[in-house]
């Protein structure tokens, strides 16, 4: 689901400035985030959660916010194919900075993956061969069932950087009001 201009230019700028000034951002070295720089839950992102959640709930149902994560991609960075961990049912990825020539799409498979993602799969062809490229302009977002649909970004080959923030929610489950009735 594409959401055009879900964040204003000023909101994007505020988040990027907080990221650039943060002493807690980390250079990622593992295979799935290689060469990117990340920041867990920038405080400025929390002020946006309620408004964004209201836009998502008509499509995804009742949600409970889990966390946000901001990531900058530099030349050589990747986001390996994966599904989000349990508890991160719905993901909203928003472009905060597009300081490069060309495109850097978020790829999302149309084929679901059931169960915890397995990093050691011999091939990802079943998911990569039936995928859609989601190109996000500044302030645009893409929302998906991140726990169910594999998604990734290919290697960032451009000069400059691409900065995105990811908001994650879990689906609220209706409370159990009565114990199950015995059968048999």
Feature-to-residue mapping (PLM):
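Catalytic core of non-heme Fe(II) oxygenases with the double-stranded beta-helix
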Residues: 75-147, 174-180
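A short hydrophobic beta-strand segment most commonly corresponding to one strand
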Residues: 91-94, 158-175
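Short, charged beta-turn/beta-strand-edge "cap" motif at the junction between a beta-strand
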Residues: 147-151, 156
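Histidine-centered active-site/metal-ligand motif
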Residues: 82, 150-151, 168
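A cross-taxa feature marking solvent-exposed loop/turn segments within ectodomains of secreted
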Residues: 63, 99-101, 160
């Amino acid at each position: 689901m594409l959401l055009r201009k879900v964040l204003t230019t000023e909101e994007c700028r505020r988040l990027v400035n907080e990221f650039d000034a943060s002493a807690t951002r980390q250079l990622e070295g593992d295979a799935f985030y290689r060469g990117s720089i990340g920041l867990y839950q920038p405080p400025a992102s929390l002020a946006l959660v309620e408004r964004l959640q209201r836009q998502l709930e008509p499509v995804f149902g009742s949600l409970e916010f889990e966390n946000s994560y901001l990531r900058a991609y530099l030349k050589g960075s990747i986001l390996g194919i994966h599904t989000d961990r349990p508890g991160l049912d719905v993901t909203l990825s928003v472009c905060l900075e597009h300081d490069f020539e060309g495109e850097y799409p978020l790829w999302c498979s149309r084929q679901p993956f059931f169960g915890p993602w397995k990093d050691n799969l011999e091939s990802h062809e079943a998911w990569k061969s039936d995928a859609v490229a989601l190109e996000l302009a500044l302030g645009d977002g893409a929302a998906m069932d991140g726990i169910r649909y594999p998604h990734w970004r290919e290697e960032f080959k451009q000069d400059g950087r691409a900065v995105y923030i990811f908001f994650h929610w879990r689906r609220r489950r209706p409370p159990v009001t009565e114990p199950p009735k015995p059968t048999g």
